[in-house]
Design a protein with these regions (language model features):
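Conserved phosphate-coupling serine/threonine residues in phosphotransfer and NTP-handling enzymes
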Residues: 1-3
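Asp-based, Mg2+/Mn2+-dependent phosphohydrolase catalytic module
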Residues: 5, 9-107
Length: 107
């Protein structure tokens, strides 16, 4: 996320009560915000995965840029917080989905 860790941690705690992620990566961890890919690359290192074998799902153009720069396949989430005046289909993601269920057919 591009949110500061103190803020993002509270959001994760409040919204993901039944699922606890293994880790949370924020700009505090890398010193850089998306569209820089540093956070995504760190996530791959922490999870022992290859970016070229990974998907990055985003609801903002900077997410797609970061994912592509990191070497990942990208999925534009048209159902997320797409900024007013933008269209997810304009972000040039590898895939676009309109609901979380559609992601399961891609990964």
């Amino acid at each position: 996320t591009n949110k500061p860790k103190f803020f993002a941690h509270d959001i994760v705690e409040a919204t993901l009560s039944t699922y606890k992620p293994a880790f949370l990566i924020c700009p505090d961890d890398t010193g850089k915000r998306k569209p820089e890919p540093d956070g995504l690359i760190l996530a791959c290192k922490k999870s022992n995965t290859n970016p070229k074998e990974s998907f990055y799902i985003g609801d903002h153009s900077v997410d797609i840029i970061a994912g592509k720069t990191a070497g990942m396949k990208t999925i534009a989430a048209a159902y997320g917080y797409v900024p007013l005046g933008e269209k997810a289909e304009d972000w040039e993601a590898d895939y676009m989905v309109s609901s979380p269920k559609e992601i399961m057919h891609l990964v």
